[in-house]
Amino acid sequence: MDWDDEYSHNSFDLHCLLNSFPGDLEFEQIFSDIDEKIEQNAASIKHCIKEIQSEINKQCPGVQLQTTTDCFEWLTNYNYSTSESSFISHGDLIKFFKTLQDLLKNEQNQEEMTLDLLWDLSCHSSVSFPSTLSGTSFHFLSRTSLHSVEDNSSMDVKSMWDDIRLHLRRFLVSKLQSHNEINNSQQKILLKKQCLQQLLFLYPESEVIIKYQNIQNKLLANLLWNCFPSYNRDSNLDVIAHGYQSTMLKLYSVIKEDFNTLCEILAPSSMVKFIKETYLDTVTEEMAKFLENFCELQFRENAVRVVKTSKSSSKHRGAVHALVTTECPQKGRNFSLPLDKVEFLSQLIKSFMKLEKGVQELFDEILLSLKITRDTSGILEKSDREVVMEKPRANETNIPSEQSLPGKEATLLDFGWRSAFKEVSLPMAHCVVTAIEGFSTKILQQEQNERSSAVSYAMNLVNVQQVWQDSHMFPEEEQPKKIGKFCSDIMEKLDTMLPLALACRDDSFQEIRANLVEACCKVATAVLQRLQERAKEVPSKAPLKNLHTYLSTAVYVFQHFKRYDNLMKEMTKKPIFLVLVQRYQEFINTLQFQVTNYCVRVCATSILQDAESHHWDDYKAFYEGERCSFSIQMWHYFCWSLHYDLWTILPPKLAQEILVEVLEKSLSLLASRYARAHPSRKRTPQLRLDVTTILICTENMLWSVCTSVQKLLNPHQHTDDKIFKIHTHCNNLFTTLVILTSPLTELYKTFQHGLDESASDSLKSFFKQPLYWVSCISHFYPSLLRTPSAGGLKAEGQLKLLLSQPRCNWNLLLETLLHHDGLLLRILLKSSKQVSDTENNLNQGPSLMEAIFKILYHCSFSPQTFANVFVSYMEEEQLWDFLYNIPVSTCVEYELEVIRCLRLALTDAIKDTVQQIVSVMSSRRNCETNLNKHIVPDCLLESMPKEWNYSPKETNRKESCKSFTRLTAQAVSIVISKLPTVIACLPPPVKYFFFLSERKMSKKFVELKKAGLLVWNLIVIICRIFEDGNTVELLTGASLDRWSKEKLGLICMCLKSIMGDQTSIHNQMIQKVIQSIEQQKPNWIERQLLKARKLSTECAFMTIEKSTALQEGDVALELTEQKINTMVLDLCHKPGGREYLRQIYHIMQLNEEYLKEQLFSMNSSEEKPLPIRPLKTTLRSIEDQPSAFNPFHVYKAFSENMLDQSAITKWNWNWAKLLPNYLRLDKMTFSVLLKNRWEMKKDETLEEEEKAILEHLKQICTPQNSSASDNIEEQ
């Protein structure tokens, strides 16, 4: 709405767009709203310029401005000093100041009134009050001239003015000091700004800065005194380092407050100078004093130690330097520092670097806002090229723009904290190498002692801590899980020392960094040599598991030094540890090959060497034909033990690479061996059982080595080479099974006419499809693997693939959660109601309901999942009445979790609207408060010079203040105007949810027909926020008085009336407000509500169309890998998004068996569903925690869940269906496999019919027969 008597300034908060992926209609509404606000702002500026133009024409009769350009030119060229002045009686000035002086001395609480009066005289009556102590005369702007007071007694006026200023300064300084006690940062900044602006009105900037600097210096002194611990010989260095870290954090918060306070008051150069002199220089001085005391104590300790040991020979490098007499000068002295002291100094440097980085970021924000470019070398230099223009003072004379403005060199923040470490830098440079080499040698020696004391050495492992969580250099899938303890201890110490190298700038700390880099290289090389030595001990002196540990440890060190290089490249411009990193990379590649090669060799030469099981010529059945070979079982156990070790130690990606390669190569070996097997009649069932067992075991392992559904169901020959080869080997094994073990009569029926060359291409490649072997055994072994043509994975398959991964795969997790319209999430929500109070007390984080809500809320590409999950939940729990009547206060006795989540989501959407309404009300309230509070006394008005033409505000109150009706109408219009844009910026899932919910409720609630359930709830929440003062204060930080609450209450009643509430229909004030809106824009409210409803339903219609298209098989609309990845990235950048995903994954892990049972029950034909059980949400006992690898557990799971060997022998194979698929089998392959059949053995007794069949099959695949048939065709 346009209010002609207002200078409105409208803005659009673009951050709300980041919560969703708006569609075309939403973007159209958002851009329309932005355009409308730009037009309103332009109209407001134009109106303001017209008023200025009119005022100039009125005040200056000789000037007639016709256009906006004329107005700007006149204002730009106007010069106070060249104007004519009218005379003001000197006695009048003395009378006014005398009255003002007496008023301040004799009356209390007149300071605010005085400051407002002086400001009004300066702004509206054009009276200029000097801020300097001397040399300035009072003058005022009349219609035609400027006149300076000149009188021999002018010093009396200046003396009186100085006395008034001094009184006001004391008042303002006292306020400034009291503001430091305020806890609310935003309120403190606002109040400080007001005080400083008032001081700058009275005094020059330099004096104000000095005074404020003194105030802040006292604050800083108290902070340093209370937080900076002192140092002595018995001090705990860890406590001192922690004290400095906490002090730096508090100091940064104080600096940040002053940045925000001064950025709009002072020029950047002045502000930078203030921050530097007040805080940075002071803390540097304090650190210099601390380090001076530290050095003195260290020097004395070294001197005493040297006197005691001077007669004995020194065993440590650098001991000669410690032999310094007490008469040596202070500067340049050297002393040794033990490891704990070097670590302590490194922690101090880290604290300063963190403060430096924070202050630099604050300064960069200011430079960016002022569009000032600067050199990339940081905040530690002074730039001669950059110029920052000083901000104009309110009471200074304007200078024409055509004249060149004098520029000030911008002094960039020069934080010289490194100078405080100058005295200690030389000892640190000398001792850092000794310290690092000393502790690394000690740790390596401890590892050697452990190795020497054990016959079979199993290295001590530690879990890798998540370091550098703010770094995305190495994704989770590449980070090790466990490493050798000795390496962890060494790298932990190096991490502690790293700040010594990172602190290097230009010439400072150069020697320290050089020595540190040299020591790190020596230590890393020693660790590499130790790992190489230990790797050679496998398998003769150490188990295979150690090899995984060495590989994981090498990856850990490699990533550390890559990270070091990345952190130092800003200073060094080139990688420092390049050679070292390359050596580790080569070692990692070698170890990976060694692990893979060793595992394959073990399979080939040991595990699969099974003379008893593979005695294929034996005419006795192997265990009555009801057991597979021992070697196959051992191969299965070996693969799963390897799987366990890789999953618990190595980085997930590397673990899968190794396992898939071992699986592929061992399958290649098995396929080759079984293709060459020539079993007897009694041993042929064993071969069939062996191959079937291999295929079932491989199917079970595939879930672990495939990282996506695409790789699992449709691997590509080039991008998924290893997976594709595994399927090829399995297809070859199954080919062996079919040709070698099928009944001879069935084989003859299929191949009696030869290998059919006329078969189609689809038939030719059918038995070579990746999942062909799975489909062949699925009749007997119901695998969860399903080809895309068969509908892809079910929910059980998605769950199995997700939980088979070595880590939480975010993309796969989200895909599983969204699968089948959130089927798993619906199960979790049902079961979450059964979670015990004990479980809830153990879980201090967000609830499962909140985690599911937050995840689905931001899945903009799958709005139907959010809607279906929560609509079904609301339906089951019968919560529709709560949805119609959402509370806003958190103080309600009991609030359902899903309703609370909805309330918070909608409250966040209308927060900006509430903020704008409260801002309008607060500004109006402040206006009325100032008018009523700061009334100028009559005695002061009477003493005021008439030439000033001052008119009190009270006389223009009716003209300057809006009526009560117009204020309410403006607030209501803001709410209604913002509704469409608020809905446009809501994520599609919540809009579709309210659309479906409205269908459930519309018959019961007639009011919803006007604007829809979503609009209704937004209005209701806004009203209830306004009715609850506590919620308003929490959202906006504004405290409301009785007047504001009454006005907000009236706004609520108007909004309810618009939405159809009949209780306030007879209220005249409400009707008056609504009529005033309608008079300005007829039917505008109704159009806005219809637009909001359209935006809330359009998304729903699009979702319905999409669901229909998917049911009809439109693949383009499915959730592609790219869409899943986009939503995962969006979720991980949302506050708490990663934690919500991890929490759901953790609960799914703990309840895997229960979820499988529920999914199986839903798919079965049983009418009675399984009972709902409470979910496990925490590991409550040792039994729940994963234990070491247990082969008996694997055997039990293998025999009970995967493979019933006796049942497999009774499988009724459908040979008539299987064999025709091999009509285009290669003749050579068919010939070799045919020769290996038991019937081809010389000593086998066959019937005549069987002999004839064999002869016929031989002729089919012999080259002679092939060439003869070719000759016949040519003839």
UniProtKB/Swiss-Prot annotation:
Q: Which keywords fit this entry according to its UniProt record?
A: Disease variant
- A Pfam match is DUF4495
Task: Report whether Signal shows up as a keyword of the record.
Answer: no
Linked pathology: Polydactyly, postaxial, A10: A form of postaxial polydactyly, a condition characterized by the occurrence of supernumerary digits in the upper and/or lower extremities. In postaxial polydactyly type A, the extra digit is well-formed and articulates with the fifth or a sixth metacarpal/metatarsal. PAPA10 is an autosomal recessive condition characterized by one or more postaxial digits of the hands and/or feet. A rudimentary digit (PAP type B) may also be present. Intrafamilial variability has been observed.
PANTHER family hit by this protein: SIMILAR TO KIAA0825 PROTEIN (PTHR33960:SF1)
For this entry, the protein name equals Uncharacterized protein KIAA0825
Which species is this UniProt entry from?
Homo sapiens (Human)
